[in-house]
Regions:
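Core segments of cupin and vicinal oxygen chelate
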Residues: 7-57, 95-102, 107-112
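Vicinal oxygen chelate
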Residues: 2-9, 41, 62-91
């Protein structure tokens, strides 16, 4: 199980809010990277999704692990995508996708790919 994931979005606050709603958790600011938010699932593992402003790159930086670097222009689309299991009905997921993201149903035969 993956308990931590980082993605970029044009509107990190909105994206984190939608993810938090779907996960039954809450979205909070992520101070290490200004303008970022953390969608917390509020489970026993501390699972969540960090949402950075589009154009943010995380570069290796020795002992601290990494440094956030904002590129001068947003790249538009990226290759990051993931499947997230939530205890939310399909209609609510569909409504959330209408707020700017995308969603599609997944079947058991599709899982793990």
């Amino acid at each position: 199980m993956i308990h931590h994931l980082s993605i970029a979005a044009r509107d990190p606050k909105q994206a984190a809010g939608v993810l938090a709603e779907l996960m039954g958790g809450k979205a909070v600011p992520f101070p290490p990277n200004p303008g970022s938010f953390f969608a917390l699932q509020l489970d026993e593992h501390g699972s969540g999704v960090e949402v950075y402003p589009a154009g943010t790159e995380l570069e290796p930086n020795g002992d601290v692990g990494g440094t956030f670097v904002k590129q001068p222009r947003e790249r538009g689309y990226g290759s990051t995508h993931f499947a997230l299991s939530v205890l939310t009905d399909a209609q609510k997921v569909g409504r959330s996708a209408m707020s700017g993201g995308s969603a599609r149903p997944s079947s058991q035969s599709n899982s793990g790919r």
